[in-house]
């Protein structure tokens, strides 16, 4: 599904009522694009990946379960994800960006029920990146554990190799990026669970698919969409 730049943008969205999510396979650039959107549009980010990694380090029942699921490249249960997301949404205002949630239709329906019609998602960005590019990206991906900032040693490297630009702390590779079998499992899980979700949002008229393997070009398209539909 290619990006349709000829879509009718007659329905405008107020900047302070922008409720958006980014959907994409592992390595599609959700974190990278989220950070750019945060900077350019002053959007609070709720990053499910970062939240889950933080919870997985806790010695609790949920933490142990999440750590096991992440290590295997499996999805976290809908119930746990719903609790985590709603807890963070209660602390956020009317405008925000969800990074990596929902991941299946049931989660989307649960989110809609929680938000109700007046507060529903009004922009869903789908980052459509070829699988070969995804595999290359995760091999070159480095993250700052404390903030979740994502770097790529090829197309978005840190100023100093292996060092976070902001804090000066060391960067690391995610454990689920190192194992090729785990990565393949994550891709298949995405196809099985998340791709049907696109039809759900397409039917609601809020889906925008960006089919660019280049991160910078993809962000240009994202800005083109948002600048066309946002109003002060």
Swiss-Prot record:
It catalyses: AMP + ATP = 2 ADP. Its EC number is 2.7.4.3. Residues 47-76 are annotated as: NMP. PROSITE patterns: ADENYLATE_KINASE (PS00113). Residues 140-177 are annotated as: LID. InterPro entries: Adenyl_kin_sub, Adenylat/UMP-CMP_kin, Adenylat_kinase_CS, Adenylate_kinase_lid-dom, ADK_active_lid_dom_sf, P-loop_NTPase. It is an enzyme of class 2 (transferase). Its main location: cytoplasm. One of its GO terms (cellular component) is cytoplasm. GO terms for molecular function: adenylate kinase activity; ATP binding; nucleoside triphosphate adenylate kinase activity. GO terms for biological process: AMP metabolic process; nucleoside triphosphate biosynthetic process. It comes from the Eukaryota. AMP binds at residues 48, 53, 74-76, 100-103, 107, 174, 186. Belongs to the adenylate kinase family. Catalyzes the reversible transfer of the terminal phosphate group between ATP and AMP. Plays an important role in cellular energy homeostasis and in adenine nucleotide metabolism. NCBIfam families: adk. Monomer. This is Probable adenylate kinase B. It comes from Dictyostelium discoideum.
